[in-house]
Amino acid sequence: MTTRPFVQVFDAQNKVVGKVKLPNVLTTPIRPDLVNFVHTNLNKNARQAYGAAPYAGEQTSAESWGTGRAVARIPRVPGSGTHRSGQGAFGNMCRGGRMYGPNKTWRRWNRKVNVNQKRYAVVSALAASAVPALVMARGHRINGINEVPLVIANESVDTLQKTKAAVELLKKINAYADVTKVIDSKHIRAGAGKARNRRYKVRKGPLVVVSGKTTVSQALRNIPGVEVANVSRLNLLKLAPGGHLGRFIIWTKSAFEQLDSTFGTFAKSSAQKKGYTLPRPMIANADIVRLVNSDEIQAAVRASKVVVKRPTAPVRRSNPLKNLRAMIKLNPAAVSTRRTQVKSLKSKGIKVSKKNQLRAKLVAATFNQ
């Protein structure tokens, strides 16, 4: 999110010729999740319906042989004298059979997106285009650009009619490096699409946004990756191709000044979009650590309690098979068992050692406790 009050305006020679106020739409909250969701749904509206033929995979008079032949009950092609006879048919697991759940032309191809969601996604994409880090993260070559957003004087863009002059302008403002990236990125598509009239894939270049009727689209339409859009009809599919924020945008001065009337401000509704005002950020400063550690908040917060943690004595674990006290804690019946053993030994005339007698006394003392 940018906080600059003004943006410089450059001419065809890349010299500063003025400045223009930064529109509020470029300071709106950036919602990549919403942009991705809206782009995914809007992109589905350009699909063409397709489907499998109604009788594909079922144009044979196959019938099941039934049970008792030790073969599957799938329908089988009749006849003899050919490899095809006796083969399974119709099923999606069979060669030459129909697919499971054949595609139908009455599938729900289009998606409806709420108007406010679409507008929020557009303003988020515009705000992201004013953050150089997001523009560079998307892959655009803007190292030589003087300022982002880049605003060009009207007379330098609106009068363009030839592609040669447009290329010269892009070179003057150091934006042609992004076009070179597009030219170098052309490669053959992976997959079957290369045989379906979409053989090559290329990256996206800069987007030139103008206002009113101009001839600049004729001059720019033959430059790879460069697209032209009208500020009154901005499309999310162009502002965030692939649902990715940070498109490099070249504005004309008139289009840049028209953003406030097109999308409105934080205090004033839009003049073109009925009843629409820009979404406000929930917090003015997104640096939460800085806010929490500020003097104002720390003065109102109680000091944290210092808890002295005293060291605890280590727990002594005794083996109950060797330590009689530990065994008695686990099994009180061990007392009577030990007494019975001692009495049994004495009755048989076996001399009981003093150690066993001491143990017996210890057992009795523990039991009496």
Curated annotation (Swiss-Prot):
UniProt record, GO biological process: translation
Modification sites for N-acetylthreonine: T2
GO-annotated cellular components: cytosolic large ribosomal subunit; extracellular matrix; lipid droplet
InterPro entries: Ribos_uL4_C_dom, Ribosomal_uL4, Ribosomal_uL4_dom_sf, Ribosomal_uL4_euk/arc_CS, Ribosomal_uL4_euk/arch
Key word Phosphoprotein present: no
Any one GO molecular-function label of the UniProt entry: RNA binding
Record's keyword terms, sorted: Acetylation, Ribonucleoprotein, Ribosomal protein
Organism superkingdom: Eukaryota
Homology family: Belongs to the universal ribosomal protein uL4 family.
Name of this protein: Large ribosomal subunit protein uL4
Organism from which the protein derives: Dictyostelium discoideum (Social amoeba)
